[in-house]
């Protein structure tokens, strides 16, 4: 499972990140990929990185396999679980930009600074069902990609092939597909952050008992559909705040409200599904903020001249 979130502040600065909700941790950590680091591809020519990247992931055979990452220009991407729907190509297609599905993270962050350019380039992309190596399965993912101006959702499904959606809500969770989630929001148009008022029912005064009545019916469980509704509702209605400290707090307040608490969800294997980490990237200061289920202290990591020009991967 997972929840992705993005918004901009009153100055147009981007805050973008996610919850990672899984049944285990993978030994993930913050990784900085510097400029001029070797970047192999399965179907394209190998190259080196042009832009420094920061995010959370694991290193596999020297390759930074990111769960979410952000380049030095402020473009970010996060991959979220998309089970039962994701279906990638069985092999490369002539005339297409063929990428193993895991390669899209660094392909996007290395080649683009704006979502509008990513959207155009994706028209010629073929995502191939190819794992990073024989020890890993292909993850059934969809992606949210964002800069300070807009966000898109990229899905490759059995039914529709590749689809790219504009994400005006700044939210993504898991299956079903993004268009289904947008349709489902129609069930919640009666929600309002303002409290309900007293009414007269055939002469009988009926009054609310306390605050929060306008949002009565807002979901609070952990299924993807309900996390989508709640995160979208909070993202739309959270007041604008000023300054990085307040906006990072806003970000974590929203995502922690849809976090999966250990013990509340047990999967069919008998394992707890829970929010392993929450992360937020501030594009203005090139700062990656994160905390973990077992360590709530907010940690910060930065892209700066030293880290962006390092001679090897930096892992924390």
From Swiss-Prot:
Keyword Signal: no
A Pfam short name: CBAH
InterPro entries for the chain: CBAH (IPR047711), CBAH/NAAA_C (IPR029132), Ntn_hydrolases_N (IPR029055), Peptidase_C59 (IPR052193)
Binding site for deoxycholate: 2, 18
Keyword Repeat belongs to the record: no
Record key words, sorted: Hydrolase, Lipid metabolism
GO terms for MF: hydrolase activity
Family annotation (CDD domains): Ntn_PVA
GO biological process: lipid metabolic process
Active site (catalytic residues): 2
Induction or repression: Constitutively expressed. Exposure to TCA and TDCA has little effect on the gene transcription.
pH dependence (UniProt free text): Optimum pH is 6.0. Exhibits stable activity and retains approximately above 80% of its original activity at broad pH range (pH 3.0-8.0).
Catalytic activity as recorded in UniProt: cholate + taurine = taurocholate + H2O; taurochenodeoxycholate + H2O = chenodeoxycholate + taurine; taurodeoxycholate + H2O = deoxycholate + taurine; glycocholate + H2O = cholate + glycine
Domain of life where this protein originates: Bacteria
Temperature dependence (free text): Optimum temperature is 37 degrees Celsius. Exhibits high activity in wide temperature range (10-50 degrees Celsius).
Metabolic or biological pathway, per its Swiss-Prot or TrEMBL entry: Lipid metabolism; bile acid biosynthesis
PANTHER family named among the record's database cross-references: CHOLOYLGLYCINE HYDROLASE, HYDROLASE
Similarity comment: Belongs to the peptidase C59 family.
Functional description taken from the UniProt entry: Bile salt hydrolase that catalyzes the deconjugation of glycine- and taurine-linked bile salts, which occurs naturally in the intestines of humans, releasing amino acid residues and deconjugated bile salts (bile acids). Can hydrolyze the amide bond in the bile salts taurocholate (TCA), taurodeoxycholate (TDCA), taurochenodeoxycholate (TCDCA), glycocholate (GCA) and glycodeoxycholate (GDCA). Shows highest activity toward the taurine-conjugated bile salts TCA and TCDCA. The activity toward the other three substrates (TDCA, GCA and GDCA) is relatively low.
Full protein name: Conjugated bile acid hydrolase
Organism of this sequence: Lactobacillus gasseri (strain ATCC 33323 / DSM 20243 / BCRC 14619 / CIP 102991 / JCM 1131 / KCTC 3163 / NCIMB 11718 / NCTC 13722 / AM63)
């Amino acid at each position: 499972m997972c929840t992705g979130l993005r918004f901009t502040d009153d100055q147009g600065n981007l805050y973008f990140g996610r919850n990672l909700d899984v049944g285990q941790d993978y030994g993930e950590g913050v990784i900085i990929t510097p400029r001029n680091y070797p970047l192999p591809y399965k179907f394209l020519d190998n190259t080196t990185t042009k832009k420094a990247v920061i995010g959370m992931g694991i290193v596999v055979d020297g390759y930074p396999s990111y769960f979410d990452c952000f380049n030095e220009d402020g473009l970010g991407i996060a991959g979220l679980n998309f089970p039962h729907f994701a279906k990638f190509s069985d092999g490369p297609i002539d005339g297409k930009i063929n990428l193993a599905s895991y390669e899209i993270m660094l392909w996007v962050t290395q080649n683009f600074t704006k979502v509008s350019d990513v959207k155009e380039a994706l028209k010629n992309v073929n995502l191939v069902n190819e794992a990073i190596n024989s020890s890993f399965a292909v993850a059934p993912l969809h992606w949210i990609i964002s800069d300070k101006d807009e966000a898109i959702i990229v899905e490759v499904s059995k039914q529709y092939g590749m689809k790219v959606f504009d994400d005006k809500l700044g939210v993504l969770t898991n299956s079903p597909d993004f268009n289904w989630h947008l349709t489902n929001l129609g069930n919640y148009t009666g929600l309002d952050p303002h409290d309900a008022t007293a009414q007269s029912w055939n002469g009988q005064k009926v009054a609310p008992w306390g605050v929060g009545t306008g949002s009565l019916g807002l979901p609070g469980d952990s299924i993807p559909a309900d996390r989508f509704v709640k995160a979208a509702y909070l993202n739309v209605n959270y007041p604008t705040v000023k300054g990085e400290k307040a906006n990072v707090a806003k970000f974590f307040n929203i995502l922690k409200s849809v976090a999966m608490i250990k013990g509340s969800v047990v999967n069919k294997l008998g394992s707890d599904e829970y929010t392993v980490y929450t992360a937020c990237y501030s594009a203005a200061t090139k700062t990656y903020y994160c905390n973990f289920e077992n360590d709530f202290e907010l940690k910060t990591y930065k892209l700066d001249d030293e880290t962006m020009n390092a001679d090897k991967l930096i892992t924390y």
